[in-house]
Amino acid sequence: MKKLATAAAVAALLGASASASAWWGPGWGGPGYGSGMGDWMNDMFGDGYGDFNMSMSGGGRGYGRGNGYGRGYGYGNPYYGYGYPYYGGYGAPYGAYGAPYAFPYGAPYGAPVAPAAPAQSESK
């Protein structure tokens, strides 16, 4: 019986302390009405200010060497880009000087290939 009385006393003390520490009424000092949903937002959606800056930049640089028309293109190259010896880049009749001086269409740019040296004969 003594154990039952002790258990009842402990339960009563725990119940009283739990009730005393509970929040009775609106929390955080509220007025006691309203749902409380969104009350923490204040006037956040009233006056506002925003700023946005964006900058974008790009660039490129290149350097290349090569042949386009004959042995070069532009001032300072032999024959000023017309090739050696003055062949056009597109062929007849669209070459620099027309037929028969223009290279045929589809032929490689630049000077013609030099003929092969004759074979040496064996003489003893």
UniProtKB/Swiss-Prot annotation:
Instruction: Report the domain of life of the source organism.
Output: Bacteria
* Residues in the signal sequence: 1-22
Keyword flag Kinase: no
Could you list this entry's UniProt keywords, alphabetically sorted.
Answer: Signal
What InterPro entries does the annotation carry?
SGP
Q: Which residues form a coiled coil?
A: none
Keyword set includes Signal: yes
**One Pfam assignment:** SGP
Q: How does it assemble?
A: The protein envelope of the sulfur globules is composed of the three different proteins CV1, CV2 and CV3.
Q: What does this protein do?
A: Structural protein of the sulfur globules, which are intracellular globules that serve for sulfur storage in purple sulfur bacteria.
Instruction: List the protein's name.
Output: Sulfur globule protein CV2
